[in-house]
Amino acid sequence: MSNKVKSDIEIASVAEILPVTTIAEHLGLDADALELYGKYKAKLSYDTIHSLKDKEQGKLVLVTAINPTPAGEGKSTVTVGLGDALSKKDKKTVIALREPSLGPTMGIKGGATGGGYAQVIPMEDINLHFTGDFHAITAANNALSAFIDNHMQQGNDLGIDGRRIVWKRVVDLNDRALRKVVVGLGGPIQGVPREDGFDITVASEIMAIICLASDLKDLKKRLSEIVIGYNYKKEPITVGEMGYEGALTLLLKDALKPNLVQTLEHTPAIVHGGPFANIAHGCNSVSATSTALKLGEYVVTEAGFGADLGAEKFLDIKVPALGKAPDCVVIVATIRALKMHGGALKTELSEENVDALAKGFTNLQKHTESIQTFGIPYVVAINKFITDSDAEVAKLEQLCEEHGIPFSLTEVWEKGGDGGLELADKVIAAVESGEEDYKRIYDDAWSIEEKLEAIVTKVYGGIGVELSSKAQKQIVEFKKYGWDRYPICMAKTQYSLSDDPTLLGRPTDFVIHIREFIPKLGAGFVVALTGDVMTMPGLPKKPAALNMDVDENGNAQGLF
């Protein structure tokens, strides 16, 4: 008998999948509430969303993690498995996830719909083109770029300074060659030559806007507030001044609607939006989460990368827009990541190393302290891998007990919802404890410097911030325009609490270096670029795409 471990797509391809209309029935919705995209995917109509507005909200559980290894620590897997486990506990549960980006799917991740026996399906569709949301966002973003270049070509009534355009084109791929380009070459009729560049679609401000807009009216307002660049007087120019917010809203009207799918165990899953947490705010859409809260007793959602990135942004940026804080936070930790933080080489993470695990435990400690700073009860989910030794598991459990950290050994990758029943019990207990006393770590009225200081000292564990001369000048400019009242969205490496990806564990006495700010007024925040973080990733030497294929029957291979 073969002991070969099945791949995610092998598991998903033989799973029983129910019609999405049946999944909707579990939520009390009939077929008329859906806009079908085939048999197993649907969007929730605006009428449906509007009909739920007066319903009581359920309980919200946020899943985050420690600082990850490049392969990720199974946050989506735990989110799905916990949702299935809560369903087994007779809690009416809805999972709210982000949509995967094609860039990392083709690059390093190979997919992002959970893993093993804790997946959302149809995973092939979700990982590739899904319902076309990302394509619509890409089209809207690049339409705006075309409108800008056309305006300059056709007389430039607004006096747009081509040297000071901050709006970039996007593509939903990892393509380092497009980071900096020149457009408008070829003579007078081909446009006005200028420097430009591409970001990945998930870093687009329009992606953030889709994920923070409450409805079509709010979407249009936010689009109008996008700053595309500056005129020759160095004054900001917005989409509203150009007059294209209506056209952009038209392109995005369907992309704003949340998508309904299911898990392998048929728990309803609303999958919508997908900003990265290292270069954007890292949370699925407000529309998806708020709709899920009206449909379920329990909603399990996630925020990208570690608690220093996704969770901080969820709590400081998304919660005010959502109008509800999490009732409990789950922090996903893996033995392999803790060993990495304790000094083990990336090539040796599958080998037993109890000493490295003990040293790396400080990274987990810091993240638990950060969540407590926000006043929210938490549970650590030890996401068990088949390479974890019994001695390592015992040591991590011992360390958690010694430090009073609530935890649960979680085996949802191998066992699905059954592997998360203890975690579900502890989450339910934390939610029902009523201990949630949410507080943001800064107020919007604070200065940019004060907000940065709060994030760095309270969440990262650093001692302060160092601003480049450009960043210092920008702060003066932003105060003049009133932009200093917006929340801060840090663009930072996901691998370290600092802005140095090689500084692992729990570093101390470090400063965060801010090289530049980007106003994202439509999204409603100011991005602070730290270190060398890129808004357009590159591909690894051997992309995951090398292992992807499709057979003669149209079945995908190599998605994992």
Curated annotation (Swiss-Prot):
Pfam families, per the entry: FTHFS (PF01268)
Binding positions (ATP): 69-76
UniProt-listed PROSITE patterns: FTHFS_1 (PS00721), FTHFS_2 (PS00722)
Pathway membership: One-carbon metabolism; tetrahydrofolate interconversion
GO BP term, pick one: tetrahydrofolate interconversion
Keyword Cytoplasm: no
Keywords: ATP-binding, Ligase, Nucleotide-binding, One-carbon metabolism
EC identifiers of the protein: 6.3.4.3
HAMAP family: FTHFS
Record protein name field: Formate--tetrahydrofolate ligase
Record gene name: fhs
